[in-house]
């Protein structure tokens, strides 16, 4: 009988929790990848409709989207207004395809949305188990069991990405108000 009461209470709390979450949904996009996701094209080549959002009209290095908030590769779970600004090989202000995607999502949604992104160029999908260096996107359980996140000095991009998602949920997404 006590077990049944506890089970009913758990189900009630779960239903109330899910109802609260469902009544206040937010849009969250999760993006991960390698060089093509991390930015390889100079901001000078942005489409004109995105350049129009720039506050720096010489190199298009600064600006902000109205609704898109992003947490990218920082391991802190903190969102900032999105602007294409990847840095590669001494070149600043590079962009990837997602800059266009987020722009059109803004036009469609017309409300704040969040992006959790972990994208690193020069990485590999399949780990070389004998490599002492490198950063890898792998979900192989035997490899993950011995790997550490790149954000902690290891070589697993997936574990870093998972940490970033957790931090974003804990610091921001779970605390949003309607």
Task: Mark where each language-model region is.
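Sec-dependent N-terminal signal peptides
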Residues: 6-16
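N-terminal secretory signal peptides that target proteins for export/translocation
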Residues: 1-4
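Sec/Tat signal peptide C-region and signal peptidase I cleavage site
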Residues: 18-22
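Cell-envelope and extracellular/periplasmic
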Residues: 23-178
């Amino acid at each position: 009988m006590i077990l049944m009461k506890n089970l009913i209470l758990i189900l009630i709390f779960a239903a109330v929790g899910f109802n609260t979450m469902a009544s206040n949904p937010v849009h969250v996009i999760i993006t991960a990848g390698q060089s093509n996701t991390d930015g390889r094209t100079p901001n000078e080549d942005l489409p004109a409709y995105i350049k129009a959002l720039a506050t720096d009209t010489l190199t298009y290095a600064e600006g902000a989207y109205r609704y898109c908030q992003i947490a990218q590769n920082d391991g802190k779970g903190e969102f900032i207004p999105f602007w294409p600004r990847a840095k590669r090989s001494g070149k600043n202000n590079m962009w990837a395809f997602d800059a266009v995607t987020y722009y059109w999502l803004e036009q469609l949604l017309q409300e704040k949305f969040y992006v959790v992104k972990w994208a690193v160029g020069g990485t590999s999908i399949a780990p070389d188990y004998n490599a002492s260096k490198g950063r890898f996107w792998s979900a192989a359980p035997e490899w993950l069991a011995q790997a550490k996140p790149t954000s902690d000095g290891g070589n697993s991009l997936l574990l870093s990405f998972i940490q970033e998602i957790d931090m974003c949920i804990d610091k921001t997404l779970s605390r949003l108000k309607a």
